[in-house]
């Protein structure tokens, strides 16, 4: 068994979350974590987390597309000052805030979390009601989770709304490194 499975943004998850075997994929992923595996998922891999672990995170819902793969893809491109809410991450960074950059439209946004979910990073961010035709009405998402983690059985899941690609800065990279080594 693998120790960690990474589901990066852009993973082709349509078959896994909408196909005939979607419930089987979700059950297998959940069992993997319950038996001690870890999952790291980012941005567009959110539907996999939502299907396998629905009780830990609530997702923003788009007023235009309220279900399906576009439903929680509401974040606008922006750089924001985010609060590091986890004491361990805050101590490792030596600071209480970091700059988080989103360089693309329609990033996946969380709305809230269950009590058992650990929130590492929070911020207020701008969103838009995206459709297949582009952005629509703008809105503000106040104090939303950007990075979370939760235990399931013997394993752990970490989800982050931001990428670790071209728009990453040193603070974002350090947070992600700390979280991956925690898995």
Label each residue range with its predicted role:
Residues 1-57, 154:
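Helical hinge/lid and interdomain linker segments adjacent to catalytic or ligand-binding clefts
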Residues 26-30, 108, 147, 176:
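Short amphipathic alpha-helical segments and helix-helix/interface helices
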Residues 33, 72-76, 183:
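Cysteine-dependent hydrolase recognition
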Residues 52, 169-172:
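A short, polar/proline- and glycine-enriched secondary-structure boundary/capping micro-motif
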Residues 56-71:
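Acidic, Ser/Thr-rich peripheral helices and adjacent loops at domain boundaries
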Residues 71-170:
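Catalytic beta-strand/loop cores that center a nucleophilic Ser/Cys/Thr
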Residues 176-183:
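Short, hydrophobic alpha-helical segments
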């Amino acid at each position: 068994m693998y120790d960690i499975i990474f589901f990066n943004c852009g993973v082709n998850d349509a078959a896994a979350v909408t196909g005939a075997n979607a419930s089987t994929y979700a059950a297998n992923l959940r069992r993997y974590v319950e038996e001690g595996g870890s999952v790291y998922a980012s941005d567009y891999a959110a539907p996999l987390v939502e299907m396998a672990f629905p009780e830990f995170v609530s997702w923003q819902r788009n007023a235009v597309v309220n279900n399906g793969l576009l439903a929680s893809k509401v974040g606008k491109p922006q750089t924001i000052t985010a609060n590091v809410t986890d004491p361990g991450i805050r101590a490792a960074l030596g600071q209480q805030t970091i700059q988080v950059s989103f360089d693309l439209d329609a990033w996946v946004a969380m709305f809230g979390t269950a009590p058992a979910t650990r929130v590492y990073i929070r911020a207020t961010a701008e969103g838009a009601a995206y459709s297949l035709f582009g952005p629509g009405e703008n809105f503000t998402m106040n104090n939303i989770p950007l990075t979370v983690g939760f235990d399931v059985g013997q394993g752990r899941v970490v989800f982050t709304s931001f990428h670790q690609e071209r728009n990453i800065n040193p603070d974002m990279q350090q947070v992600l490194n700390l979280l991956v080594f925690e898995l």
